């Protein structure tokens, strides 16, 4: 003891001590400390200013610290810890202190029902295990079943979290009963000793029981604690114990004073125990290899006197002692068998079994082992790195002895020999030293002279006989035939003449080393360390390809053959380099040098055993055996007998060893494929069980293995288990007829397979994709049920064919079904389908199936399965119906369904599939025909066309009760329509009744049923309520009921009368040229008001003239299907085909009187040209043109100028401020010119310019088109012209700002369609909504409630006046003009109603675009994927970027709305319908931005928009 303490003090004082001495002192210090820590694990960190002179004194200090009250140190929970970290910590700590914690729970379990309260559980966890936050504790409670009273079963808690690392804590040696003080009984001594052992636990139990922190416990509770943790005592013994420590059993006990008094009274015995513990530790330290070492704390002050080299050596030495436990613990932390664990888990394991290192030093050590600390740790690579480091960095230092004069002379002589030895080459010194270090790590530490000469000839130079004899005489004067390697290393280290050798003046060149000698030396080095060499190569080849990188190959060769020069390495690399990739074929390299591929290392083998196996160097007396070839010797050592192999196989089969199974299946590929005897022998060799021919023949005979029949893995496991049960009698495995019960044990039922399949899949594969990739052998992205069956066999889920079919039926599958990856993933994970995911066809194209017939059959079977099980999903693309309302299917419907379920077909394959359905070639099929082809019976209630649920879109704001009410209302509407269809029968039946008396509901129900309207009682009551018919005591007034029916009938019949009264539209498609003029006169006469309005909109100056092209556009808008030939014929007849400008007023007034006989006179009387303008008018128009051109070319600059002047943010500027802007950007205007320009601008009541209106009117010109002629289909062909720089011609308007009228009209020959009459323009209200968002988010519930109260019809709309009243009531910060913009935007049905649901949704839901990097911004659909793409402008891009979140949020219902308007299924919409859908979903687009969108998606001016191209731009 004294010697150890002196050594520790000396290590502290002498900072210049060598690294090896420090390491030994550290080992001595660490070997003493754990003996006391085994008594008190997890103690607090103790300050250590200097090493203690004796462990007794140090441990007494620790004990005194433990006996102090711990209230001063409050445990703080770590909120960063995840649930997995907490579970791991609990598993570790509970496994080490299970008994103590169980005893604590038993004390707290006063009712003895194995239950504790949640508060008791949390206090026990905080005191004994780890402090938790409230959320962490709630997460932990969620994993435990809780009783109805809220109590927790603590046994369930211990069972659930009691796994993990098995930490065995050894206590100190018990006191011999003969050495007990005579004044105390044996019971008292035993009780005292047990209190010492459980001091910390007992203190924590007292604190747990002391809920109020008073420091007191009741005497009966004190006895319960002592009897639970220590031993049971009789009443007499317990009373003596209380007298010994002055405890009154009638009052509360101060447990802190009790523990302190206990420590003082037993101080002498305590010292004795500590001295015994220290002596035991010092005496048994060298003999115990597997003992764990724990330091006194994690403070870096304890470690600062030790270098990293010393810590690394000591760490490696202690690591080998607990290798098996560490490997088991690391394997337990890798449940997925992926080979990776977290850095924190690795530190917990190493702290448990080796040292509790500070984190900074731990990370430095990990980096020295070649591992990255920023990612997860490959624990197998970590074990290999430590094993290699331990093998190569064995401690070389030996204790120095006093040299005699003879020894000095011998050393001088040896140094002279070494100097002569290295006279040829100095750079060989380091390589020779590394080689000798490897040899010195062997158990014997000797090398024969023949081996040494061989090494010197290869590495240094070829020695002649005289030089070698001199070397041999110097180091081996006794002639033993071998030399100690350490003696050579000693001379190499201490010879300053060798280490500081001056440059040689000898001109003699070094002797070259022969290549044959180098190959022999490499072969010898690799043979000695074959397993380690091959393991290190495999660590760089995780996929077992047989190749590694050139740099990695050099690293491995440098480790095991450090004497190789760069030339040698280049020669080796080039000789075995793969041509294509440049990688090294290391297996070919091993075979070429005659080594061969070694069998894999058996699992859980200790590095110490591996070291002894790899460095088999015998004692000097065994020189004859050393001269034998290394290959024969290795085979003799490694070959196993028949009994050993049978034991090994038995162990592997019982443990279901995955390594052995993988080796077997690597040859057989499948569990049911048979292999022959030679292949089975390879399996044994790869599994670390090599055998010679004789032993293997005996094993095959014992197992009954027949080469002609072969054996599969299933046969082997089943038969080998039978052999184990019967004592391995000689019965052939394949011919064994097992009993029925034994066979049933290996086959499971379909229900059991369904239950354990997800768990097995998770254990065997890293993820679902790995399993899919494993069974998809042809890599076509589709697996069959045969592939699925192979997967079950791979997971050892064996079923008979009948059960497998039942298993598929439970999953909703059949034998003929195929699955793609997404379906397989949903099958395995049961994850919900994301509604906002884009269809797979819009993301990427799938691989095509090569076989056309197989592809069609697979698609057909897939449609059968979906039609049976998921018709609702399949029918999402089936929306078309015929005139009678029956559902029909076209090519695109089935194609979209297949693509939606990721079943892609080539056009040829799909055409073949469609021909099987549409046998008559009509282009469509009915639902009945489609289901008949699928072999499914048609049901009208089930197989209906898909209908979109309107309320799903507003579900964010709609409560479930409200949804139910609205659905009931829709049902009532359909029931009311049924009543209207049978109005006459119902009216006759009720008129026949006696109207003076009320009618019972049951009679009303019966009458309606007789009239063809069967209704349930609940449906009838709700229908009467919707008709405002009162019900009293289940009776109604028949007169009131008839009056309500009459009102509904009249309102329904009125629209039909209007439709019947409207004349059919006139079509010019079948009009002959001779009838064109007459037909045109009829159309012009009937469409006179619309033509006047359209021409007036074009003739801003009221000159009566329009351009000939504009004149033709207007006529085409009212004349359906008017061809160009008919129009040109019409102009020639009117003598107007050469006229650039046409007087439209004259045409409308006199066209009805036109005749061919007076055509010349009629044309001559028409005015020819507009009147000339005055010079002032011309100058003014030029100024207006300059203003518009300046705004178009410097838009952002002018906007910035306006905003700079608008300091009050009122969107207005003064007259002088606007004039300064005109002077700067346009031209200097005279007072007269500016006054005239100012008079045409939008000015408010205060005389300030509203610059927002000014800019919008200049940047875009909107024109309301004339009303359609009677009978028009509603598809507007009118167009809107707008751009950033409008063109000006002779007919430029005189007024810059004219609110009631817009700029001009054009048709598809010049511009895009415009807003039809009655359709409000698009509005961009995003700035208004952004400003209102904060205000409405605080009161949107009250606002929604008010709107619902005003919405009596529950249509989701209120009147504009009611909305303005709510704006005033909630004091929303918007002006009158902004309110009008909102009303226009949210008037979705053009009926003057405000859609409050859409408004609130836009203001409450803050939709943001997905945050992506600059390299992955939103891309617009490529032009090559579209037929024609227009110009890409900044305004176009800014508009798309702004509306992207809204489109992504509602693109699915929007697409279905597009399809509803696209009745012909062409994928194209008219501009009017496209605008309607955008308004329906409240898309924030101004008219200018809408024009840019049209300009891009309708470059050809066809007035048709591809809505798929539009949506695809947002979904990429």
From Swiss-Prot:
The gene coding this protein: Efcab6
Single biological process term from Gene Ontology: flagellated sperm motility
A single MF term (Gene Ontology): calcium ion binding
Region named Interaction with AR: 1422-1516
Organism: Mus musculus (Mouse)
Chain positions found as Phosphoserine: 1265, 1311
Subunit structure: Microtubule inner protein component of sperm flagellar doublet microtubules. Binds PARK7. Part of a ternary complex containing PARK7, EFCAB6/DJBP and AR.
Matches recorded under PROSITE patterns: EF_HAND_1 (PS00018), EF_HAND_2 (PS50222)
GO cellular component: axonemal A tubule inner sheath; nucleoplasm; sperm flagellum
Keywords: Calcium, Cell projection, Cilium, Cytoplasm, Cytoskeleton, Flagellum, Metal-binding, Nucleus, Phosphoprotein, Repeat, Repressor, Transcription, Transcription regulation
SUPFAM superfamilies xref list: EF-hand
EF-hand domain boundaries: 96-131, 197-232, 321-356, 444-462, 528-563, 674-690, 763-798, 905-940, 1086-1121, 1193-1228, 1229-1264, 1348-1373, 1374-1409, 1454-1484, 1485-1516
Protein name: EF-hand calcium-binding domain-containing protein 6
Entry annotated with the keyword Phosphoprotein: yes
Residues that bear Phosphothreonine: 906, 1315, 1319
Region (Disordered): 1-23, 618-638, 1263-1318
Disulfide links within the chain: none
Residues where Ca(2+) 3 binds: 776, 778, 780, 787
SMART domains in UniProt: EFh
Biased composition (Polar residues): 12-21, 628-638, 1274-1297
Physiological role: Negatively regulates the androgen receptor by recruiting histone deacetylase complex, and protein DJ-1 antagonizes this inhibition by abrogation of this complex. Microtubule inner protein (MIP) part of the dynein-decorated doublet microtubules (DMTs) in cilia axoneme, which is required for motile cilia beating.
Entry-linked CDD domains: EFh
UniProt KW Phosphoprotein keyword: yes
Binding, Ca(2+) 2: 210, 212, 214, 221
């Amino acid at each position: 003891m004294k010697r150890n303490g002196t050594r520790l003090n000396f290590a502290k004082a002498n900072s210049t001590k060598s690294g090896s001495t420090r390491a030994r002192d550290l080992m001595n210090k660490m070997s003493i400390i754990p003996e006391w820590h085994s008594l008190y694990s997890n103690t607090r960190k103790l300050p250590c200013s200097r090493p203690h002179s004796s462990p007794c004194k140090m441990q007494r200090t620790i004990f005194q610290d433990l006996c102090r009250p711990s209230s001063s140190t409050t445990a703080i929970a770590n909120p960063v810890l995840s649930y997995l970290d907490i579970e791991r910590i609990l598993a570790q700590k509970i496994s080490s202190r299970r008994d103590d914690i169980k005893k604590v729970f038993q004390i707290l379990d006063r009712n003895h029902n194995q239950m504790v309260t949640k508060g008791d559980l949390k206090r026990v966890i905080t005191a004994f295990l780890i402090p938790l936050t409230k959320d962490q504790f709630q997460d932990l409670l969620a994993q435990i079943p809780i009783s109805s009273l809220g109590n927790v079963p603590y046994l369930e808690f211990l069972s659930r979290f009691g796994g993990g690392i098995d930490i065995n804590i050894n206590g100190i040696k018990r006191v011999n009963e003969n050495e007990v003080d005579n004044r105390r009984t044996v019971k008292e001594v035993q009780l005292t000793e047990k209190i010492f052992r459980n001091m910390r636990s007992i203190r924590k139990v007292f604190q747990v029981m002391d809920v109020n922190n008073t420091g007191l416990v009741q005497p009966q509770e004190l006895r319960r604690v002592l009897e639970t943790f220590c031993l049971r005592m009789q009443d007499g013994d317990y009373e003596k114990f209380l007298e010994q420590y002055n405890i009154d059993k009638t009052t509360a006990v101060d447990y802190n004073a009790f523990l302190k008094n206990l420590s003082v009274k037993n101080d002498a015995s305590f010292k004795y125990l500590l001295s015994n513990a220290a002596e035991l530790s010092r005496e048994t330290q060298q003999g115990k290899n597997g003992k764990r070492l724990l330091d006194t704390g994690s403070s870096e002050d304890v470690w600062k006197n030790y270098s990293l080299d010393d810590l690394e050596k000591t760490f490696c030495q202690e690591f080998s002692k607990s290798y098996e436990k560490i490997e088991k613990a690391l394997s337990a932390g890798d449940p997925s068998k992926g080979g990776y664990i977290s850095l924190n888990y690795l530190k917990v394991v190493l702290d448990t079994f080796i040292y509790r290192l500070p984190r900074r030093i731990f990370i430095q050590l990990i980096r020295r082992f070649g591992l990255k600390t920023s990612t997860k740790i490959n624990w197998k690579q970590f074990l290999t790195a430590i094993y290699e480091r331990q093998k190569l960095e064995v401690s070389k230092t030996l204790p120095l002895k006093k040299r005699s004069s003879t020894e000095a002379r011998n050393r001088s002589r040896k140094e002279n020999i070494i100097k002569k030895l290295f006279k040829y080459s100095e750079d060989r010194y380091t390589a020779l030293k590394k080689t000798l270090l490897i040899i010195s790590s062997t158990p014997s530490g000797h090398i024969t002279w023949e081996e040494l000469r061989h090494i010197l000839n290869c590495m240094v130079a070829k020695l002649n006989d005289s030089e070698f004899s001199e070397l041999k005489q110097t180091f081996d004067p006794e002639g033993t035939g071998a030399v100690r390697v350490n003696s050579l290393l000693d001379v190499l280290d201490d010879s300053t003449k060798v280490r500081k050798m001056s440059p040689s003046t000898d001109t003699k060149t070094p002797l070259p080393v022969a290549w044959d000698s180098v190959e022999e030396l490499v072969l010898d080095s690799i043979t000695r360390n074959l397993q380690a060499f091959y393991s290190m190569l495999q660590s760089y080849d995780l996929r077992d390809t047989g190749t590694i990188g050139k740099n990695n190959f050099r690293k491995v060769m440098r480790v095991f053959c450090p004497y190789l020069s760069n030339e040698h390495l280049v020669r080796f690399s080039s000789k075995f380099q793969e041509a294509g990739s440049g990688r090294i074929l290391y297996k070919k390299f091993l075979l070429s040098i005659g080594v061969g591929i070694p069998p894999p290392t058996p699992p859980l083998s200790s590095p110490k055993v591996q070291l002894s196996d790899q460095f088999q160097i015998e004692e000097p007396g065994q020189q004859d055996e050393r001269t034998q070839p290394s290959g024969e010797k290795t085979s003799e050592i490694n070959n196993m007998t028949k009994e050993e192999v049978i034991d090994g196989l038995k162990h592997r089969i019982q443990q279901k060893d995955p390594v052995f199974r993988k080796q077997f299946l690597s040859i057989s590929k499948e569990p049911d494929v048979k292999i022959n005897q030679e292949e089975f022998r390879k399996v044994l060799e790869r599994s670390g069980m090599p055998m010679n021919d004789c032993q293997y023949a005996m094993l095959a005979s014992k197992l009954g293995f027949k080469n002609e029949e072969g054996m599969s893995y299933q046969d082997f496991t089943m038969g080998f288990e039978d052999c184990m049960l019967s004592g391995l009698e000689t019965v052939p495995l394949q011919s064994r007829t097992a009993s029925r019960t034994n066979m049933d044990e290996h086959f499971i039922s379909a229900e059991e397979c369904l239950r354990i399949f997800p768990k097995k899949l998770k254990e065997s594969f890293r993820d679902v994709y790995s399993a899919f990739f494993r069974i998809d052998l042809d890599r076509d992205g589709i697996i069959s049920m045969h592939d699925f069956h192979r997967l079950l066999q791979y997971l050892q889920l064996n079923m008979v064919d009948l059960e497998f079919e039942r298993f598929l039926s439970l999953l909703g599958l059949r034998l003929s079904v195929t699955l793609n990856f997404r379906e397989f993933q949903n099958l395995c994970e049961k994850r919900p389908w994301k509604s906002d995911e884009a269809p797979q066809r819009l993301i990427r194209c799938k691989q095509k199936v090569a076989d056309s017939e197989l592809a069609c059959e697979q698609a057909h079977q897939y449609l059968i399965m979906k039609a049976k099980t998921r018709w609702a999903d399949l029918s999402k693309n089936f929306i078309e119906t015929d005139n009678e309302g029956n559902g029909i299917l076209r090519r695109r419907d089935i194609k979209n369904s297949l693509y939606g379920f990721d079943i892609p077909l080539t056009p040829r394959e799909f055409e073949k599939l469609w021909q099987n359905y549409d046998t008559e070639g009509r282009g469509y099929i009915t639902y009945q025909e489609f289901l008949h082809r699928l072999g499914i019976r048609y049901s009208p209630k089930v197989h209906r066309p898909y209908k979109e649920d309107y309320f799903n879109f507003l579900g964010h704001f709609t409560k479930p009760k409200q949804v139910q009410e609205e659905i009931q209302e829709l049902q009532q509407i359909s029931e009311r329509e049924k009543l209207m269809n049978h109005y006459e029968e119902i009216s006759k039946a009720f008129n026949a009744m006696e109207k003076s008396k009320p009618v019972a509901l049951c009679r009303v129900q019966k009458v309606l049923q007789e009239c063809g309207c069967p209704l349930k009682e609940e449906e009838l009551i709700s229908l009467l309520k919707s008709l405002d018919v009162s019900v009293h005591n289940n009776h109604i007034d028949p007169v009131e009921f008839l009056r309500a029916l009459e009102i509904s009938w009249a309102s329904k019949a009125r629209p039909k009368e209007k439709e019947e009264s409207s004349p059919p539209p006139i079509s010019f498609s079948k009009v002959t040229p001779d009838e064109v003029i007459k037909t045109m006169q009829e159309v012009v006469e009937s469409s006179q008001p619309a033509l006047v309005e359209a021409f007036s909109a074009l003739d801003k100056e009221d000159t009566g003239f329009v351009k000939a092209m504009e004149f033709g556009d207007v006529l085409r808008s009212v004349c359906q299907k008017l061809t160009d030939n008919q129009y040109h014929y019409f102009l020639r007849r009117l003598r107007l085909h050469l006229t650039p400008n046409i007087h439209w007023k004259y045409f409308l007034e006199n066209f009805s009187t036109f005749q061919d006989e007076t055509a010349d006179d009629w044309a001559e009387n028409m005015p020819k040209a507009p009147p000339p303008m005055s010079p002032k008018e011309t100058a003014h128009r030029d100024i207006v043109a300059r203003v518009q051109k300046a705004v178009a070319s410097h838009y952002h600059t002018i906007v910035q100028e306006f905003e700079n002047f608008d300091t009050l943010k009122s969107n207005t500027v003064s007259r002088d401020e606007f004039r300064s802007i005109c002077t700067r950007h346009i031209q200097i205007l005279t007072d007269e010119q500016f006054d005239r320009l100012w008079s045409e601008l939008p000015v408010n009541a205060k005389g300030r310019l509203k610059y927002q209106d000014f800019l919008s009117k200049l940047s875009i010109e909107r024109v309301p088109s004339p009303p359609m002629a009677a009978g028009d289909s509603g598809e507007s062909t009118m167009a809107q012209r707008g751009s950033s720089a409008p063109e000006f011609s002779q007919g430029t308007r005189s007024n810059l700002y004219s609110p009631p009228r817009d700029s001009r009209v054009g048709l598809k020959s010049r511009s895009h369609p415009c807003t039809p009459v009655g359709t409000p323009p698009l509005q961009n209200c995003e700035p208004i909504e952004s400003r209102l968002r904060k205000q409405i988010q605080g009161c949107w519930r009250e606002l929604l409630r008010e709107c619902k109260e005003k919405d009596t019809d529950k249509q989701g709309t209120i009147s504009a006046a009611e909305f303005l009243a709510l704006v005033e009531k909630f004091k929303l910060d918007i002006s009158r003009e902004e309110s009008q913009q909102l009303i226009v935007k949210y008037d979705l049905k053009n009926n003057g109603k405000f859609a409050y649901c859409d408004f609130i949704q836009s203001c409450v839901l803050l939709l943001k675009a997905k945050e992506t990097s600059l390299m992955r911004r939103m891309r617009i659909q490529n032009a090559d994927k579209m037929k024609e793409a227009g110009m890409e402008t900044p305004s176009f891009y800014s508009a798309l970027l702004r509306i992207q979140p809204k489109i992504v949020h509602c693109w699915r219902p929007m697409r279905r709305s597009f399809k509803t308007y696209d009745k012909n299924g062409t994928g194209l919409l008219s501009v009017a319908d496209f605008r309607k859908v955008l308004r329906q979903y409240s898309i924030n687009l101004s008219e200018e931005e809408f024009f840019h969108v049209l300009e891009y998606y309708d470059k050809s001016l066809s007035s048709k928009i591809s809505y798929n191209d539009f949506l695809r731009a947002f979904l990429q």
